[in-house]
Amino acid sequence: MAFHEIKVNDLNENVFNLIGKDWFLISAEKEGTVNTMTVAWATVGILWQKNVVMVAVRPERYTKEFLDASDTFSLTVFDKSYKKMLGYCGTVSGRDEDKIAKSNLTINH
């Protein structure tokens, strides 16, 4: 699967399905290392004429350290064939193993 950026205004998918049923990854970088986790809780909307997404991340999650340390993060949507990988990335901590490598994911900046 090739990586390509999708502008939010070009998104033709049902965001409720993307968030609640299909899930997605949130990833951030800290000190040259990237961590990711599966997200199934989020809201999307418009705030002060800007498109926004708010993602719920528990304070004790390892990924939160990366989000707090970074000015940016990415949200990545996958097709249904990646559901098993998304389940894995949502249950295993990056503190314990390299989820990105074990999932055969590629980081693209």
Please state what every model-predicted region is.
Residues M1-H109:
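Active-site-proximal mixed secondary-structure blocks
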